[in-house]
């Protein structure tokens, strides 16, 4: 199958949700990111995401390994705007039986794309060229400090509900090389190549013990 060309990130749809300061279930959270689609893409992406809330700031640190090297990887937390518990998809999320769990197939259990992990999360812009890129060894690091109020205000404008509820969200890492051939059955957002949004790792956000 001939790989589809990478289109502008301006074509990606954006969604987001976050919560009032002081209403967090905890002040430190962690997500252990485990591989998705590893058997198909030939690499097992994994890592750890740590999120902490202090002095009105949300600090996010993500360390990853096993990524397809040399490319930028979209990273976000996903969830349900109504506060329903999100979960990482299992193999049975592959409802069309093509061997891949694509972005659209994750929505039933994981919800929609919410907060992006790039240089400016409070913009809520999913299309962005400042997501982390993997080095030659397949490792990537992300760190960001953002005012909770800035994220809340943006999310309230977009979703009419500044609900963070980190413990009800999951984190996804996306993306494989555009040289990787995918069947047409692997679905993505309108106008966005499937290799950009294919989930390659996921972890549930939990209060750190």
Describe each PLM feature range:
Residues 1-10:
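Bacterial N-terminal signal peptides that target proteins for export
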Residues 11-13, 23-24:
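Cleavable N-terminal signal peptides
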Residues 18-20:
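N-terminal signal peptide c-region/cleavage motif recognized by signal peptidases
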Residues 24-209:
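N-terminal leader/targeting pre-sequences
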């Amino acid at each position: 199958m001939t790989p589809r060309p990478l289109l502008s990130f301006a074509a990606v749809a954006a969604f987001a949700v976050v919560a009032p300061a002081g209403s967090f279930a905890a002040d430190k959270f962690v997500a252990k990111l485990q591989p998705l689609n590893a058997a198909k893409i030939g690499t097992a992406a994994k890592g750890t995401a740590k999120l902490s809330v202090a002095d009105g700031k949300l600090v996010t640190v993500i360390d990853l390994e096993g990524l397809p090297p040399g490319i930028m990887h979209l990273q976000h937390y996903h969830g349900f705007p109504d506060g329903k518990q999100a979960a990482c998809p299992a193999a049975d999320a592959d409802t069309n039986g093509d061997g891949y769990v694509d972005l659209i197939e994750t929505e039933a259990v994981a919800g929609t794309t919410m907060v992006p992990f790039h240089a400016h999360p409070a913009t809520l812009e999913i299309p962005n060229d400042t997501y982390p890129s993997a080095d030659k060894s397949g490792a990537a690091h992300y760190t960001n400090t953002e005012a909770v109020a800035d994220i809340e205000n943006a999310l309230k404008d977009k979703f009419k509900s500044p609900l963070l509820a980190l413990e009800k969200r999951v984190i996804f890492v996306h993306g494989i090389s555009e040289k990787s051939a995918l069947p047409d059955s692997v679905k993505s957002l309108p106008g966005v190549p499937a290799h950009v949004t294919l989930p390659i790792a996921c972890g549930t956000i939990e209060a750190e013990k």
